Regions:
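Short aromatic-enriched loop/helix-cap "lid" or pocket-rim segments at secondary-structure transitions
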Residues: 50-51, 129-133, 229-230
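Residues that act as N-cap/strand-start positions at coil-to-secondary-structure junctions
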Residues: 23-24, 47-49, 172-174, 180, ...
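Conserved beta-strand hairpin/beta-sheet module of binuclear metal-dependent hydrolase folds
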Residues: 28-88, 208-221
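Metallo-beta-lactamase
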Residues: 61-71, 169-177, 185-187, 192-256
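Short Pro/Gly-enriched beta-strand edge/turn motifs at strand-loop
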Residues: 10, 32-39, 163-169, 189-191
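Short beta->alpha connector loops
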Residues: 44-46, 98-100, 199-201
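Accessory terminal helices/loops
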Residues: 1-28, 132-160, 165-166, 184, ...
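Active-site HxH/HxHxD metal-binding segment of metal-dependent hydrolases
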Residues: 72, 78, 82-186, 214, ...
Length: 256
């Protein structure tokens, strides 16, 4: 297990640059700026990883996102906390949005470190909604939605059969949280971050921007080599009409 330190690269070029040729390996942590650690956890999908950031906060650290809620991610966190992060104490967990690869281990981390969960209200309540949506009434509404959009019975049944996967990918959420909202400012160590929220990929996704250091944690709102997924769900079917014709530090792919 090792911690790799690299120098921050600044450039006036307009094109995106990727100063770190290698992403953190398994059980490794990379310091991408003073007091900013980057670690990467595996995902069981085609998009096979999620980036987690730790921000220095005095003698403690603030974690930004938690990873996928499965045994493999717990094992990876445990190895890191026994290795390069063995002296790390997480004082706050900021979760950017309600998708399982970001909120999945929130309950586990909050319990382990007795730290508060920090989210936007919409994203916290969206997580609660997903954990309680497996009722027959909701399944029937989803079935009707899928059929209206041309899916046959076989594919509809297959998709509905995945309905409980959210529960399998997310540890039990803490019963309370600390709310942050667009425009808030939060102090983390010597840095002051402005909270920016955005819709599209998620309803009210949290991003953090430190103007003094030109440091931006973009979550999944801005990705480096792919476009964020913007989906239309049964709970808000008219969204497809509203977005029709619109052109259109990331938490997937290399750090910018």
């Amino acid at each position: 297990m090792s911690m790799t330190k690299t120098e921050t690269v600044h450039s006036s070029a307009e094109a995106l640059r990727y100063p770190w040729e290698q992403h953190p390996g398994e059980d490794q942590v990379v310091e991408v700026a003073t007091g900013v650690l980057w670690l990467r956890l595996k995902l069981p999908f085609r998009l096979n990883h999620v980036n987690i950031y730790l921000l220095a906060d005095g003698d403690n650290w603030v974690a930004v996102d938690s990873g996928f809620g499965n045994e493999e991610s717990i094992a990876a966190w445990t190895r890191l906390l026994d290795g390069p992060l063995k002296h790390v104490k997480i004082s706050r967990l900021i979760v950017t949005h309600s998708h399982p690869d970001h909120v999945g281990l929130a309950g586990w981390i909050v319990e382990r470190f007795a730290c508060p969960l920090v989210m936007s209200q919409v994203e916290y309540l969206q997580s609660v909604y997903h954990q309680n949506r497996g009722t027959e009434e909701r399944r029937n509404a989803q079935r009707l939605f899928f059929r209206r959009h041309g899916m046959d019975e076989t594919l509809t049944d297959k998709l509905l059969g995945r309905g409980q996967e959210y529960l399998q990918r997310v540890s039990v959420l803490p019963a309370s949280y600390r709310r942050i909202s667009h425009g808030d400012e939060i102090q983390i160590g010597s840095r002051r971050f402005k909270v920016i929220t955005g819709g599209g990929h998620a309803l009210d996704q949290v991003m953090l921007y430190c103007a003094a250091d030109k440091l931006f944690l973009s979550a999944d709102q801005v990705l480096s080599k792919i476009s964020p997924s913007v989906s239309v769900w049964a709970v808000e079917p008219e969204l497809a009409r509203r977005i029709s014709g619109v052109a259109g530090e990331p938490h997937h792919h290399p750090a910018l």
